Regions:
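Bacterial N-terminal signal peptides that target proteins for export
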Residues: 1-12
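C-terminal motif of bacterial Sec signal peptides marking the signal peptidase cleavage site
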Residues: 19-23
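Bacterial signal peptide processing site
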Residues: 25-28
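N-terminal alpha-helical signal peptides/signal-anchor transmembrane segments
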Residues: 36-69
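Conserved non-transmembrane functional hotspots
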Residues: 59-85
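Extracytosolic low-complexity repeat regions of secreted or lipid-anchored proteins
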Residues: 89-176, 180
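N-terminal sensory and localization modules of signal-transduction and trafficking proteins
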Residues: 182-184
Length: 186
């Protein structure tokens, strides 16, 4: 009876360990949404430095950015971080509609999972304010064309909806001995 009790106890411990371990791990859907949120904020971050160019001449600015594929001229080859679906200019803003993708994998062996998804956003560059606003946009058939497993609505993501100059402070000025120094105060 002791031998049987030991086996039962070991089985219970194993079941509890597996239950606790898998119960604490984030789901694949959570990981995909986190990946998409990171990608949206990454788009805000990388486009901030081109904000003035995008506001003044958006077509030329976008043409010079190799990390944005332009789906308006044909199918994107998938070698870009972001896919431009539309570009709209008005008197008070420029709006880029982008498809942003993300993905995740979890587990290993029999528990391995992999998923990818896309969300579509409008990045609005107001002409009168140094900011970038992000809003949800319709993806159309981009998900079917590119083979994404799911389209995640922008509203399901937790991201900054507005970035301003306060989000991008200037780098700290550092001088090195023996070299020229452009820092204030020399």
């Amino acid at each position: 009876m002791t031998h049987l009790a030991g086996r039962v106890a070991a089985g219970v411990v194993l079941a509890l360990t597996i239950g606790v371990t898998t119960g604490c791990a984030p789901s694949i859907d959570t990981l995909v949404r986190d990946s998409l949120a990171d990608a949206v904020e990454g788009a805000q971050d990388v486009l901030w430095e081109y904000r003035d160019q995008i506001v003044s001449d958006p077509e030329a600015a976008i043409a010079g950015l190799d990390f944005i594929g332009d789906a308006r001229v044909g199918a994107d080859d998938g070698n870009h971080s972001y896919t431009l679906l539309a570009l709209d200019e008005s008197e008070d803003s420029v709006t880029l509609t982008l498809a942003v993708d993300g993905g995740a994998q979890t587990g290993g062996g029999l528990g391995y999972q992999q998923s990818n998804a896309v969300t579509c956003i409008d990045l609005v560059f107001p002409t009168a304010a140094a900011e970038i606003r992000v809003e949800g946009a319709a993806c159309g058939d981009v998900a079917d064309v590119a083979g994404y497993e799911q389209v995640v609505p922008f509203g399901d993501l937790q991201v900054r909806e507005v970035v301003t100059v306060a989000d991008y402070p200037p780098p700290v000025c550092q001088c090195h001995s023996g070299g020229d120094c452009d820092c204030p105060g020399g």
